């Protein structure tokens, strides 16, 4: 008949915690505090900014609001493959505190030391993208935090509001199946 049995993994490893998830307007103070909190526990941060044309300006802005000892590196899909690989290896090695990047971190990354995810313009992304990005943090015993920002003063359309509400509501580990339903 072509029908196959389906197996679901309903329990995460015992040492993992649900990711603390926040959906809010973008705020420099919140961004600074989130990055500083992660730095204080010797962790790293993903900052997803999905606009290559203005990513340098965002890096400059972050450097203005953060202390000088916070190191930021940029990564995006238009970079030369070897350059991108070197940046990612340096980030994995702990040489940078913040990886300012496009959605290229959506899949396949396992950096247990990165436990804070900041996503700019999250309202412009699909639910599966947002869910996958959130899954890049919380891959160790540390409590992870994910912040999904929309622009200050922006009125969200109904569909975007529903996506962000869903990601905020379903925070327990393994909630992907519930989100898909």
Task: Give the positions of each predicted feature.
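Post-DEXD/H (motif II) to motif III coupling segment of the RecA-like Helicase ATP-binding lobe
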Residues: 1-42
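C-terminal helicase module of SF1/SF2 nucleic-acid helicases/translocases
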Residues: 28-44, 50, 54-57, 61-181
